[in-house]
Amino acid sequence: MGRRRLLVWLCAVAALLSGAQARGTPLLARPAPPGASRYSLYTTGWRPRLRPGPHKALCAYVVHRNVTCILQEGAESYVKAEYRQCRWGPKCPGTVTYRTVLRPKYKVGYKTVTDLAWRCCPGFTGKRCPEHLTDHGAASPQLEPEPQIPSGQLDPGPRPPSYSRAAPSPHGRKGPGLFGERLERLEGDVQRLAQTYGTLSGLVASHEDPNRMTGGPRAPAVPVGFGVIPEGLVGPGDRARGPLTPPLDEILSKVTEVSNTLQTKVQLLDKVHGLALGHEAHLQRLREAPPSPLTSLALLEEYVDRRLHRLWGSLLDGFEQKLQGVQSECDLRVQEVRRQCEEGQAASRRLHQSLDGRELALRQELSQLGSQLQGLSVSGRGSCCGQLALINARMDGLERALQAVTETQRGPGAPAGDELTRLSAAMLEGGVDGLLEGLETLNGTEGGARGCCLRLDMGGWGVGGFGTMLEERVQSLEERLATLAGELSHDSASPGRSARPLVQTELAVLEQRLVSLETSCTPSTTSAILDSLVAEVKAWQSRSEALLRQVASHAALLQQLNGTVAEVQGQLAEGTGSSLQGEITLLKVNLNSVSKSLTGLSDSVSQYSDAFLAANTSLDERERKVEAEVQAIQEQVSSQGSRLQAGHRQVLNLRGELEQLKAGVAKVASGLSRCQDTAQKLQHTVGHFDQRVAQVEGACRRLGLLAAGLDSLPTEPLRPREGLWSHVDQLNRTLAQHTQDIARLRDDLLDCQAQLAEQVRPGQAN
């Protein structure tokens, strides 16, 4: 009821002030026709209490301004996404749950309100017209207190500030506002009344006195009426024309009717003014508030399209991320298989290199063993070196004996002649005879001594060098004997003379034996000994050749082992199977056993060489030991052959396991093909999802077409809302169906991952 009364009051104000246009039309005082009732805007009733003269400088203007208010327009639903983290691990994607939530919807209502503004009448300036109320550029007078409005039924109260025409909203008036079609009808009625009143006011103003229209300060105080005041001041020429002829009685009667109608509206103006003053503070706050944009159907359509586009993008991004995750996982599995194959090939290459190194080491050890055997074949003639050492020892003993003789000669008690003879005879028999016997034995083994002494570290010197050394030492002995004889002759003349012939005879005997020794050291005397040595060397060579043949058989077996390893390496290179670490470990163990056996063989060979070097006392014992060692070597070679046969059987087993690995690789390939089929099914599902998204877009287009008819919401508010809620329910059902499809796709993806894991696990175990 309050709103209806407000509308009636606004209609009355509009009818009263309908002559005002957009910029405002002033209402000036004018003389009333004879016989008409007098009425003033500044007094209430028909008998004004105060003189209206001081108030005629102010005129009431009709101004239009916009009023905004916030209204609640039902509720709207929006989709809220809730993200939940997966509990299975960081690689598992989270789940998204979409919920429909209702929230209130508001709109901003606009209303153009017609109001009264008190301003200076055109052409009035001075102390009775304040500066802030002046319309034209007149001289600014000193400000005085505003004139008091006469009290009565219509109390204007504090005069509101002047308002200019409100600028139109950038969005325009969107559809019916707060009061709907009733307000539009009232505005149409007000506009028609304004046109009618403007026509009548023009007819009345054409008969008015120009002097009174100017409203100068010298004009007499007359009752205030209605009229249209032209822009600016009235010229003096118009004043001189005088009053015009009065119009017809019909015009005056119409003016009287309008005045009576205005009198009936005064009471309504009182109530409207009171309500306006009561709502002034609220209106001021609304005027100061910035206008907010209107929520139109275009904005709603744009919002719905943006949300659907974001939802579609998020769903497509989720599918793309899942497909990329599946593809990356398949790529990682393929890279892992490739890496395992490369590791197997690298392990086979390292095994081949280690076998080559072991083969070279075995060959070097066999060559060293052959050289040691060749050295042992000649070591039987090492007694010559011992005989040379014995000769050197005897020479040293001879020198010591001479030194003792010299010291005894230099002593205070010189021995007698018979003692000298005994000493010289003992020396010659004990030292020189032994030396000559050693030389004879040395001549018998000259050929062996030459071969042995060539390997001595002190230098290579033969029989000739040894003979020169002996001659030098014999000469030194002769010189020492000569000096000894001189000393003896100097000390005792008679004993020396008796002993000199004995010494000379001893020396002559010594020279004869040396000459016989030189004559006996000829090649003809050593031929028999050399023949025996050559026969012995040939026997040793035959034995070493037999040992070399055994070593050659060993090398052939090693070459066969290398060929088998090469075949295994070729099979490893051709196969595309997974890990071969267990088989390679077994092969390494076998090779380690072979290397250990070869190491034992080398140790036994070193022991044999030590035994050969230690068995220099007897050739028979050496021969027996060599035969025993050769027999042991043969036994080890036979045992090694059995081990090689076992290794061959293990290689055959490895071939069978390689075939099994190939079968496992074929199974993995079939699993990958099934994974590809699953990926194709996922792509088909994504295509079906695109079709569903297209259906959702079609539904959104239909929703937009339905939203285009929302302008008729005030008249038909139920059917569009029901259709909108039905489309919202359809959108919710579509989202629920999409959620189920996403869950189904996730389950299919997890099943595919589980199948791949089950297929890869047996290959890793093999």
Curated annotation (Swiss-Prot):
PANTHER family: EMILIN ELASTIN MICROFIBRIL INTERFACE-LOCATED PROTEIN ELASTIN MICROFIBRIL INTERFACER (PTHR15427), EMILIN-3 (PTHR15427:SF2). Keywords: Coiled coil, Disulfide bond, Extracellular matrix, Glycoprotein, Secreted, Signal. GO terms for cellular component: collagen-containing extracellular matrix; cytoplasm; extracellular region. PROSITE patterns: EMI. It is found in: Secreted, Extracellular space, Extracellular matrix. GO terms for molecular function: extracellular matrix constituent conferring elasticity; identical protein binding. The keyword Coiled coil applies. Residues 132-179 are annotated as: Disordered. Its main location: secreted. Glycans are attached at N66, N443, N562, N616, N732. Disulfide bonds join C59-C121, C86-C92, C120-C129. Residues 467-491, 615-663, 726-761 form a coiled coil. It comes from Homo sapiens (Human). InterPro entries: Collagen/C1q_domain (IPR050392), EMI_domain (IPR011489). This is EMILIN-3. Residues 55-131 form the EMI domain. Residues 1-22 form the signal peptide.
